[in-house]
Swiss-Prot record:
Protein name: Kininogen
Role description: Inhibits papain and ficin (cysteine proteinases) but not trypsin (a serine proteinase).
GO cellular component term, pick one: blood microparticle
Compartment list: Cytoplasm; Vacuole
Tissues with expression: Expressed in the skin, liver, intestine, spleen, pancreas and kidney.
GO biological process, one term: positive regulation of cytosolic calcium ion concentration
Domain of life assignment: Eukaryota
SUPFAM superfamilies associated with the record: Cystatin/monellin (SSF54403)
Glycosylation sites: N74, N235
Amino acid sequence: MKLGVRLCVLVVFSLQLWGPGQGQELEPEQVLAFCDDKDVEAAVDLALVKYNQKLPYGNQLALYQILESSKAQNDSCTQYFVEFNSRVTDCPAGGDKVWRDCDYLPTGNKVPRPCKATVHMSETDKKVLAVFCDPVEAPVVAERTTCLGCPREIDVESEDLKDPLTYSITRFNADSDSSHHFILNSVGFATRQVVAGFRYRLMFDMRKSNCSKADHKELNDECHPDPDVELAHCNSTVDVAPWRHETAEANVECAPGPLDNFDVFRRRPPGWSPLRNFNNFAEVKTTQASTASAKEESSEESQERSPSAVTMANPEPALPSVAPTTAAESPFHCPSKPWKQFVPPTTLRPAQEKSPTPLPVVEEGLSDLDLLGKK
């Protein structure tokens, strides 16, 4: 069965490479599919089930709306490429329920989470080849007591991972029997824990480089991915204490093959590696902040120009920021109808303050006798 899946993937991949070389359009065999097609919905269901099974903590995701779908097929199998929005549910990760038995979390983020998935389907086998859901800014929640000694998830694009990844890859290259050095391919998951220093736990995969160990004692800027693709995925634990000026301790366990595609991971931006500079994320955040500020000013101006919008009584609950689109607007019924209606909690307006009770009006002036209680 696994052999059939590999052959199907190989055929589709070969067609993708063969098409442009023959002067044809890229991926000519990939065609649009109906968003409300039963097979497309089944592909999304498989992707969400697989994604939720791999969540280490938090809450499961459920389908909100299928945005776009396409498929590529041959005589033996069909691959579906789907884009959809999801929402956080009230079912915890690792529970017995599947997402179809859950409800949207009322306190979840109003903005849905965009997801992409690639699913292989044939008469004899169904398999999720890749699924990824882009995280969105978490809603503000009540403060909880901080666990100072517990592992904390950190962003896979954080600069703090540069040294732990470098130690891990260096350790692998020193211990492996490969004739070539390996370089970073993608990072899947990372946590940091305060111990006698910092303990990093990493999930990542690497790719063989063009630098042989005979010609290069260690990795350098001349090392690039080798055309002969060879991958290895690793779990690494790195203990560092920079203030003690001690050599970091890295425990790396690796196996051949890529990191599972359905695990939550991001591929590094082009040009990033432990040996290269990071992108200027601060500049991006500054740009986003200025854009948000401009939107707020524009919103305030529009409210001043239309006072009727402010005085409207009993407003309806706010809809999601990505409003559902009717299927009739697209010939392929995309986006699809929402799986369930999401109604975020409404913020009650504070009661209008009561005007202070007016003091009694004294027509005649007070005398000293009045203050003494004498008439």
